[in-house]
């Protein structure tokens, strides 16, 4: 085992194992998927990306959530986050869904490009939540802050099968999730 670990890490080992003719050393390498790959494959619910670039799969989030596409991350997002943080007294975390009701799914390179805007500045949580109902389930008890354009879409019946009743039911479920 020690020789296999040394070999796998690129270190030469002088350890004599006294292997007999019937013994053999097998080395097996297994790669670990990146957190973004796990999310895209549906094997993770969230990926929290910290300002220093560290990523954590399904790390609990207790913050104010500001969803957006962040293409680009601009002064309006920053000001909305500052206002929300001062009102709620909580840290604001930006949420970027890698899938969207209105757009094709984001590719890994595009996700990384959008995340690069936040390095050293803010925490981002990546999700696959296309709707606010799904977002509320992922972050129970977390307040959400949204801009005007998102508020208009939130109450548009077309996102609820063109049904005002479905929209009101979904909003009630979001409210119930806290």
PLM feature spans:
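Nucleotidyltransferase catalytic core that binds NTPs
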Residues: 1-178
């Amino acid at each position: 085992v020690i020789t296999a670990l040394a070999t796998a890490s690129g270190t030469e080992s002088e350890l004599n194992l006294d292997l007999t003719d019937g013994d053999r050393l097998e080395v097996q390498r297994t790669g670990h998927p990146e957190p973004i790959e796990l999310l895209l494959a549906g094997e993770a619910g969230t990926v929290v990306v910290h300002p220093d670039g560290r990523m954590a799969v399904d790390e609990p989030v207790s913050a104010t959530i500001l969803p957006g596409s962040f293409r680009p991350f601009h002064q309006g997002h920053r000001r909305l986050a500052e206002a929300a943080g001062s009102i709620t007294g909580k840290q604001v975390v930006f949420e970027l869904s890698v899938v969207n009701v209105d757009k094709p799914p984001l590719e890994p390179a595009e996700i990384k490009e959008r995340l690069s805007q936040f390095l050293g500045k803010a925490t981002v949580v990546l999700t696959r939540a296309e709707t606010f109902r799904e977002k509320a389930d992922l972050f129970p008890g977390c307040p959400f802050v949204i801009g005007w354009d998102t508020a208009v879409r939130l109450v548009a019946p077309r996102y609820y099968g063109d049904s005002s009743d479905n929209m009101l039911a979904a909003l009630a479920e979001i409210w119930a999730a806290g």
